[in-house]
């Protein structure tokens, strides 16, 4: 298959050393597989993970060490390629720096200018469909806390331990807001609309039962780094509709 390329994060020294260690371990295991004087026969195994056609995506969606947490790699070979991060021709007509969430297609665009946009696949929860319009990113947060609303706690009493009174759920890999969150305000008031990370890569490109707009953690980190404070955002059910 042929996939478009995009900007990638360089492999960290820690990641390189980890790969080197895995290579050394593989050599050691190969030596252990040999018994006696003749060569050992090892049953071939089918290849695992993405093949070479995924190119830079292997690194783009590889493991990330961030904020004291190790974000695992995304099995990109199990995701529809259209939902992987990529530069596309801008279909929105919006000014550079604008975020557009197209809820009908499960895409988020960040307009780059010069007729191009960065496109991300998103998963949409019920709250992701409940609000539409123009607003701004009021503030951004790395590894945010999560506080379930009272209505959710009423449905799932086990979440009471993360209530506002109890300080919310601390940051971490199991936190529903993931590695980053962007908080959307309209005319100075919180819309309760969020763009946030998620470890649930299999929800990208789908509509799920709860939540706002979720991106893979690797993608929300990329978006967070690109978007300045007060960035304009348009949420619409179709490009060209506002």
Q: Which residues make up each language-model segment?
A:
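N-terminal targeting pre-sequences for secretion and organelle import
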Residues: 213, 218-242
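Mature exported/compartmentalized surface modules and terminal targeting/interaction regions
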Residues: 8, 13, 56, 238-242
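Short, basic/aromatic beta-hairpin or loop at an interaction surface
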Residues: 203-211
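N-terminal secretory signal peptides
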Residues: 1-31
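Short, solvent-exposed aromatic-acidic interface loops
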Residues: 124-126, 198-201
């Amino acid at each position: 298959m042929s996939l478009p390329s995009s900007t990638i994060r360089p492999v960290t020294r820690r990641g390189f050393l980890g790969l080197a260690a895995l290579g050394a371990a593989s050599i050691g295991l190969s030596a252990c597989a040999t018994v006696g004087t003749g060569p050992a026969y090892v049953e071939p195994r089918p290849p695992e993970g993405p093949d070479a056609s995924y190119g830079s995506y292997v690194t783009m969606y590889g493991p990330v060490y961030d904020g004291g947490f190790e974000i695992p790699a995304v099995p990109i070979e199990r995701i529809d390629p259209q939902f992987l991060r990529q530069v596309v021709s801008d279909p929105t007509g919006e000014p550079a720096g604008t975020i557009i969430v197209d809820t009908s297609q499960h895409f988020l665009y960040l307009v780059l200018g010069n007729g191009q946009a960065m496109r991300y696949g998103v998963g949409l929860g019920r709250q992701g469909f409940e609000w539409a319009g123009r607003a701004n990113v009021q503030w951004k947060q790395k590894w945010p806390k999560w506080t379930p609303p009272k209505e959710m706690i009423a449905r799932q009493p086990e979440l009471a331990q993360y209530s506002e009174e109890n300080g919310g759920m601390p940051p971490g890999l199991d936190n529903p807001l993931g590695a980053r969150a962007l908080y959307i305000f309209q005319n100075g008031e919180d819309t309760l609309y969020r763009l946030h990370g998620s470890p649930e890569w299999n929800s990208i490109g789908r509509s799920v039962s709860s939540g706002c707009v979720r991106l893979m953690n690797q993608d929300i980190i990329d978006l967070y780094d690109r978007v300045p404070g007060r960035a304009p955002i348009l949420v619409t059910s179709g490009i060209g509709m506002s």
